[in-house]
């Protein structure tokens, strides 16, 4: 049976909650905050490939790490439509 592992990081000056969901060396980040280096180090040390980033909203404290993460992992970023 496959197991999902959910890890919580509290990141940045706003103490943003970031969640990493892991399964079979693949992972998804939810609201990666502004600490790309910390997240990249964790992913590397745990032999995880980042397959997607999900954003609950576009505030600065939730999206600061996106450029570095997308550049390194070439993964899609998902966010709701603007109305």
Label every PLM stretch briefly.
Residues 1-46:
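Conserved beta-strand hairpin/beta-sheet module of binuclear metal-dependent hydrolase folds
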Residues 35-83:
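Active-site HxH/HxHxD metal-binding segment of metal-dependent hydrolases
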């Amino acid at each position: 049976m496959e197991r999902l592992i959910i890890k919580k990081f509290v990141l940045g000056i706003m103490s943003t909650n970031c969640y990493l969901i892991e399964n079979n060396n693949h992972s998804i980040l939810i609201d990666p905050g502004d600490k790309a280096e910390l997240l990249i180090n964790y992913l590397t040390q745990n032999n995880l490939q980042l397959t997607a980033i999900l954003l609950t909203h576009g505030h600065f404290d939730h999206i600061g790490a996106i450029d570095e993460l997308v550049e390194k992992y070439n993964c899609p970023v998902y966010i709701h439509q603007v109305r």
